[in-house]
Amino acid sequence: MYVYTMENVPPSTNYLYNPKIVYNDHDIEFNVNYMPPLELDLGMAEINDIDNSINNFTNDTIIINPHTNFNSRIDGIYNINGKPIQSITDLYNLINTIFYDLIDVIIKSTLPIFNEHILYRVIGSKSLELYTNPVINNVKILTYDIEIVGTNNEIVLFLEKITMQLNAYINYKYGPNRYFIRNILRKYNLIDETCNWHYENESNNMFKFGFIKTTNSYQPCIFIHLILKKNLFTTGLVNNSNQTNNNHNVIYYPCVKFYSSKIKYKPITIANINYGRLPLIINKLLDEINTRYYNKELLDNLLNVNYFICNPIIQQQYCSENIKNCFDKNFSSAYYTDKYLSDFIPTKTNIKIVKDILNQYYGTYLFEFIKTHNCRSVFDSVLNPFNTNDKKQFINKIVDIVRNVDENNDRSLYRYTQEDHIPINLYCQMRNVGLLNDPKILDLIENFHQTKNDVDNLDNIYGILSGITEYTNSIDHLFKDEFDVVSVQTFLYFNAPNGQIIDSSNLTMDIGSIIYMPNFLSTSYVFFKDIHKFLSPVKVLYKIKIKKDIMRPLNWILVDKYSQLSNEKEILIKSGSFFVIESIEYLPVEKINESEYYNIKVITMRLCYDMDDAISHASNFGTEKLLYGYVNSNNIIGGSSNSQIKKISGPIKNITIINTNTLIIDPELFRTTSLNNYNDILNSYVSIYALLCPLLTNIYNKISFIHKKITLNYNSQKNSEKNLPIFDIPNIYSDSESHLDNLFYNKYRKYKTKYIYHKYKSN
């Protein structure tokens, strides 16, 4: 890939000038001559970089090949899976992973601003996420492909304006995201202190627009501009633009590619983002199948029923009133195959392939997938936790017991069901991260002492209820051995090693991951009437499996009618609970009073009794799993994350649990309005980041092994289990490094790249 940035354009010309040059690409010599970029009319005006830094322009535009001779590495550069970075391609793949969430959210926050001004459509791989499950799909692409309908001048103007808006998000309104970029790069040992100026100085635009030099043309594109440390590669510096820089490696990573079209039609709009329709998406993937190695895999996934998710477009047009409409004798896949072929100008070579793929997709979806999946609405399913028809009597008895216990504890539970749930959960969140003594917290929690008292009382109530025989017997009689509850939430992630910032868009969290929630979690055992008011495309529906066991202390309370909102049918899960992710899927939601569907992310988790139980259950999904959300003051100053965790009791399979020291925060604790779009998400993320910034500075590269257990074979007849020590890394010369077992080294170094680098350097 070859990149022009606007800094390369001579200010005295109205066109791109490129002298004839010679360069080597994989030992093959090419002659490159100037070609107009996609036949754009650049006579409109001088095209400058949006920061108007014309002093950086040069008269000669030089293209280099970033892949040539850069296949060596220094020790200490590893990808998210612990494998060494050995080439520029490996580096691009890592950038794609760790910046996926941030770029995705920022672009989705920016595009709605331009909905009324220019007709655009998101096409290609990003649009395919509407049709195939992006979680189980191992092809996750950071780069957006956007088709624009308009004149060449309008396209260039749009390119400039959207770049300016992206920089506004990064630089001003959402300044802390620059530090997010810096910290995640530093976590993977890609930058050092000599690079900080680029990320901390707002005058250095992180987003720039220019062109990618392809075989036959120049393609308009927006890049994220990354400055990496000088000694990243042993063979020299890499710079995929024409700029000369002898101090650092320079990467312009494409995050938005633009294409022109003269075909106008109303796009599909979901969450205020305009998308192209499926024929156009397939055609674009076919057009670039030779230059994008993952396009074939994306198309294969579109034909694999195991990757399918409910199609909201078909849903709202044909299946909303009666699911049988989807199988009417007059309805066939050919209807969709032929209807939208006019969305693009087909070539003779790909029209047949597009039609074949469409026929296979719609045929499989309509006559195989939808027969085994309830694709009407996630809320059409029935939740029923009870195993008796005489539930009213037992519910009333349980509620009376809960009321009596609560009245002896200053009615803290009832206050929680009112507006006090916000300060109570905020207290729990800040207790987890060790910030209760921060003066800013006292400003956020007005009645701090009452809130502390309520939290203590609530913790006591769970224990008291578990000791009341009448209560536990009623629970045992009323509830099934296992049942489901639901909760609509949005959680923000800080310091996640995979670059995650929000649970609704992130695609890299593994099945079997352990989630620690420091706050109380309100759930419902029915889909109550007003649940739609809490929904938006940026929310997640958590489906939580609860296993009843009255022989253990219960970490959930049936609140039911003893609540401010009695129709919620509430079950309140205790603060400090552990969950294990069992599945992630996307299911349709129908907007109230609107005939519009969209898919919402549904995360199914199992509520565990304690850390031991969570580790045991996580072992069913693999041998190496991550723990999210567990951070406290002990972790910040060094030492074990929890002294009680050192003693893991009971039989546990071979498994490594790594504490990522990721903070999970409920943003609605800091807001008076609900979260409805990605702009709301970024506003919340930044406001919370400002509060957590000192804490994140201390823990951003800290990691702990919570539990490690292996089986050692001393001889063929005897096996002996050995608990390895818990590893915590208070500094770069941690003694715990010498105790590492080779079995876990790859996973360990994934989070220890900075330390390994310093040791290498010191030698």
Swiss-Prot record:
Annotated organism of origin: Acanthamoeba polyphaga mimivirus
Protein name: Uncharacterized protein R390
Main location: membrane
Transmembrane segments: 684-700
Localization (cell): Membrane
Keyword annotations: Membrane, Transmembrane, Transmembrane helix
Residues covered by the TR mART core domain: 380-607
Any single GO CC term annotated in Swiss-Prot or TrEMBL for this entry: membrane
Domain of life: Viruses
Membrane topology: Single-pass membrane protein
Cell membrane recorded as keyword: no
